[in-house]
Amino acid sequence: PHYRSQAYYDSAPWRATWKGEGGGVLLNQAPHGIDIFTWLAGLPVRVMAKTRTRRHKIEVEDEASAMLEYANGAIGYYHTSVNEWPGGSYMELCGETGKIVIANGKLRFHTLETPIQEFTEKNDQMWASPPLREEEVVVEETESGHKAIIRNFARAILYNEPLLSPGVEGVVSLEFINALVLSGKKNEPVEIPVNRDEYDELIEELKKRSKAKKVSGPTKRITDPHHLV
């Protein structure tokens, strides 16, 4: 996600509070990337997360990391932060016959000529590695950003146009986020689907302890310039 300074969080009393936002980087800045991540990899069945407030004077987390376990035995790792600049987005999906890398808007395929397990078992050369083919996938540019989603939503209402992002898909990302928040606060592994009663109890307790921030001057309502296109 994009970097955030203390001035951003101090722009309104509700920002970065459990009562006002209900979460930090995971719920506010990270969901766009989490949407893509869970769309490609699906939901894990278990997470072990570490959430912390590292550089800001706020109630909620500004950084989160997690080890992920999937039903098929795969292991994943997730990290997000608003403490880094320059920021960026990087995602890898590794499989039996290669790897997909998505980095800062570019997509690359790394295709193995021999499946990794087969090469590992049959190769007799000490320092050999499987031959591979690399290619960058040119993705056709389309209208994107908030403007495109809002236009699509309006056209769905007016003309029954299929939604690009149906609301039900957001539930998957929210389940992922809730699991990391719960695991981070408990400091122990959490199963997915999340125990609803346990999560609700945690959020209610955090909201009770939540306090609105004191801000100097009027509340600022300025759109993130990254989302104006």
Where are these regions (language model features)?
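Glycine-rich, aromatic-lined ligand/substrate-binding cores of catalytic
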Residues: V45-R46, R54, S65, E69-I75, ...
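Short arginine-rich
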Residues: F176-K186
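A short, glycine/Asx- and small/polar-enriched loop/turn
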Residues: E59-E63
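Predominantly a Rossmann-like dinucleotide-binding segment in NAD(P)-dependent oxidoreductases
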Residues: P1-K57, N187
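A general structural signal for well-ordered alpha-helical segments in protein cores
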Residues: G33-I34, H146, I150-R151, I177-N178
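Glycine-rich phosphate/pyrophosphate-binding beta-alpha loops
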Residues: P31, H56, H79-G87
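C-terminal glycine/acidic-rich active-site capping loop/insertion
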Residues: Y70, E96-V168, V190, N195, ...
